[in-house]
Every structure is written in structure tokens, then in C-alpha cells.
Amino acid sequence: MANKENIPLYIKERFSALYQSDQTLKSLFTIIHDQEERIFCEYLESFILKEVTYTVFKSYVKKTAQYLLNNKITPNHEYVGLLMDNSLNWVALFWAILMIGGKPVLLNKKLPINITEDIIKLLDIKYVISDVHLDNKNYFIFDNQNKLLPEIESLDEVKKEDWENALVLTTTATSLNYKICIYQGKDIYHAVMNAKGILKKNKMIKEHYNHRLKVLAFLPFYHIFGLMAAYFWFSIFGRTFVFLKDYSSDTILKTIQRYKVTHIFGVPLLWNTIAKELKRKINQLPDKDKKKAYKGIAFSYQLQNLFPNYGRRIARKILKPIQSQLFGDSVFFCISGGGAIPKETLYLINAIGYPLYNGYGSTEAGITSVELRSKPKYRILGTVGKPLDSVTYQIDNDELLIKGQSLCSEIIYKDGQKHIINKDEWYHSGDVFKKDKKGYYYAIGRNDDVYVGENGEKIHPDEIEKYVLMTSVIRYCFTTYKQELALIIQLSKSNYAVKAETINKEVKDCLSLLKDKGYQINKVYYTFDDIANINAIKVSRKILDRLLNEGKVKLEDFNTFSSLVETKKEQLNDEIVHRIKMVFSDILNKDINEIGEEDDFFMTLGGTSLDYMTLLIKLEQEFETKITFDKKSFSTVKEFYDYIITKEK
């Protein structure tokens, strides 16, 4: 769709305002919210779409500042914790804390609460604004609804502002050793200015749908990726944010389609989930349709490599049935960051017409690079691009070193030690990188996460995971266990038996593929225990190692899986047949013992066509699946059983 505004001119005006600013957080607030009637966010209230302009939101922030003062939150340039999920009120509180002289500590809700409490104690935080009810006198409980709250709207704007110029982020603690990173206004300013170089290198990032650019607020704003790439890079241009009611896959997909979201930023877990769901749906199709779908995806990928923009438009047409079950046709730009992403995931998402780019950054250094080339053949390589304008890279002994003005100003370690960052010196990232002949960088793994093979070769598990996308298991992880390179898979207790054939095939194919790539996996283990926190965006090998040592995760040799499945299948067969019979019994008002496995629903049991429609609905609800017929319909318990078992696989 053509854009109503002159986007290049408006972008120039935005950067001009930044150039003329004093590079403080206060000036960023003014520049962001001085955008007349541009829409900051949209939300539904009583089934009515509400729009909040940046002008209205600016006033709301000032009223929120007064609300905090009224509730005796007077920071005096000390730390103030913010422990909430994304919402328009999270953003309002973030700015309001700064406005009344507080240093907002953006606490990570995905961390265990004991780590959060440690951070609060370490920084001596006297006020924590939270949407979590905890027995702690420091906590001020806030009703975190995603709407303008009447109790705040009714207040006057704060009269006296006392701006602070620092914000605080915490690392994700996947290594068990969290860090606290302090960013000054100038650091954030330089990070925001990186948007200029990105816009020059990639035109798709500016694309609108129906004259609007809307960003899904999926990534938490307390995460550097969410705060910088999603919030700051787009709010500076007055773009619209769409917040989620919850993080269920159904809510995410419906929200994207309902609000016509154009830009999505997520961690590999999101994209892997989408890729898994896509493969699952395609593989459930009849063979003819399945081959047609994969052929269409391959054609779309090839066409986009020849003509990126034209190919993407064609992809939206020929793959419309696939897109309609995912994000719809409004999504133009996606970025993955925060960990390794499989090549197959990058291929599938890009091929179906959703441009997915891979980026790199850290809490300490900010977002420092992203792959921005227009052809998907480059994006699926797994490169994280070239360094952004505010930083430079150097590789020393395989480790990435970073230097630049957008790094944080200070790091506070778990033991209380402080380290001031010298922007003219190299920062050791701890990440293993390589660089190709064209100057593009690749993240390989962590320095402290390496397996040394029998021949002395160093193997990084993250590098292995880039080749693998397993759809039949809950989570999987390549790691060193008992001094061997192992694959650990987490299975679902409820359906591992019916998925056994797929699980076995995926494990076999995975090992074969990796062997061809030169990786020998010595052992495969399975478990039904959680190998990561339910909220974790990826499996932390250090945390998994601790769980194994503490006996909280029990592993079984995968060689014993088949015998376990056979035992379970006997129980499962009886259970599924019983559940189907119960549905028959309920609809036909017959005793369950009167219903045989091969009794015809109509001829033997006396069901009507209306009863049959009810039967289909009830069975779909019972087994959480869609029943579709290929050549003939089903009318016996056995036929429905065979179909459900096949679908489960």
C-alpha cells in the first residue's frame, strides 16, 4: 500500500530533532511524544477499538508521575524497580519514574523470584512497582491493565519535574550469574541513532499496511532487544504499538491478524514455534496437497531471491491459505534475536513471505548488528550482519570484542563489584564469532560453553542447534553430559506414545544430518521433566547441568524408549477408544457397553445426521483436533480411533 505521508522527509525531521537534542532521556521523551496526533497504541475496550495518540499519552505519563508522588513514591534519584509485563502502563510508568527523579530498574519477570529479590537487595531498591502480588513491603502493587486507567486520567499533570538520566537492565541469568547494566541517556541516544544506518540498508523496515506501521509488543521491554529494537527504534518515528492480552499462541496469532500488525520482533523460540506449527499443518494434509504446499514454498523462496519485492508480493498470493492460518498478509518485517536459530526456521518463515532477519546483541552492549540483505538466501545463512554505526567489531582468539558509544556505562556484578565501561576500549563479549570474506559476522556460541572432541576439536553446541528443528518434542538441547556430547529431549507425558514414530524418525534424521555435517553425537537421552523454566526463551545449559546434579531432571537412555512406548500404547489404545465411546454414548444416550468398536453410527447404533454433526464437534473438542475427510467419512469408533492416532503423529 502507498503511504499517505512523505516518509523520507518525516524521517529526516526526526533525526534532525535528535541531532539538535542534548542526548538526555528527557529530550528523548520530548522528541518521541512531540508528534501531534500520531497513534501510540490501540486496544479493545468493551469491543470498541480505542486509539491513544502520542499527545494524549504524554499527558497520561505526566499524570502517572503525579500518581506515583501521591502514593508516596519519592525516589530522590535512587533506584525504582519496575516488575511488570508489557502494556501501555508499563511505558507510562517507565517515563514517569524518570520524570520524578527515579532510576528505573527494568526487572525481568522471567527470572526466578529469588534472583529478583537478590537484585532488589543488592541495589537497595526501596520502591518496586509490580503487577505481581508478593509479601514484601517494598512492593507497590499496580493494576497493570492495558488501557488508560480512570484513577490516573482524573489527576492533574505533575507540576515539578525532576528528571533522572539513567535506566537499568538486568541480564537474563542463563549462566546463573546475573549482571546489572546501567545505561545513561547518551548511550540510549547513540543506540537510537543506529536506526539511520538500518533505514539506509533496508527499505522493507519502512513498509506500511493500509497506511499504518504497527509493532507487536511481544518482546518484553525489560529486555534490551524489546526496549531498543521494538520500543525506541519505532516510537521515535511515532509508530503504533499493539500489546498482547497474554502470550498464548492463539492470542498472538489473533492479535496480529485483528490489528494488522506489520512488524514482529521475537526470540528464536517464537519463530521455531511458528515453523513447527507450519510444518505440522502441512504434514497433516493429504499427500497431494502436502507436496503442492512444499512446492509452492520452494518456488516462493526461489522467486524472492531473484526479485525480492516482487517475489514477496507473489508469495502472499500463492501462499495465502498458509499465511491466513498464521499472521495474515499484513506482516512486512521480522527480526529474531537472543540466541541461535535453526536454518530450517529461517528458510520456512522467509519462504512463505515473512522477511525474517537475524540480529545480535547483549544486555551489556545493546543491539549491535543485524543481517539486513533483501534476498532470503543470505538471511538463511544465520549471519547476524555487520556492526551497526555506533559500534565496531574485532575478533580476537575467536571471541567477539565490541567497542562503541552505545554500550552501557556501568556493570554491577552479582557480588557487588562495579565496572565502568570505557567506550574507547574493547569489551569482551564472551561470544565466539567468525567473519566471512564479505565482512558478515556469525555467532557460533559461548566461550564457556564448549565441548572438546577426541581429536581436540572445539565444538559449540549452539552451532549444532542451528542445523536442527525438532517438531515432535517440547524442548531439546545439545550439551556435554558425562563428558560426552549428548542430545537431551524433553517429551510430553500425555502424547509421547502416539508421537513415538515421529520422535524416533526425527532423532534418527537429526543424528544422520549432524554426522554429515561432521558432528558425532555420542548419546541421546529423554526426560519428562522440565529442562528449562517454563518462561525461559531458551534452554540454559548451565541451569540444566545444575538441575541434573540436583536430581530435578532424570534422564533415560533413548535406547529404552521403544519398549516404554509399547507398554504405554497398550494403555493408550484402551484409553482413547474409551474416550471415543464415551462421546458416542453421550450423544446417542446409550450405555457405553452397548457400543462396539466396529458398530456403525447410523446403521447399527441408530444415529441421525444431526447427531453426527454433534458427534464431530464433540470429538474435535475432546481431542483438540480438526476432523476432515479425504475420500470417505467415518462412522465407527475404530475409524475415528485410526484417524485420531494418525493426526496425533
Predicted regions and their residues:
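Conserved pre-ATP/AMP-binding loop-to-beta segment of ANL
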Residues: 37-39, 151-170, 176-177, 203-214
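Conserved AMP-binding/adenylate-forming core of the ANL superfamily
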Residues: 40-74, 78-87, 94-95, 114-117, ...
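Conserved AMP-binding A3 loop
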Residues: 51-55, 166-193
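Conserved AMP-binding/adenylation subdomain of ANL enzymes
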Residues: 192-214, 221-316, 320
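Conserved C-terminal "lid"/linker of ANL adenylate-forming enzymes
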Residues: 508-568, 616
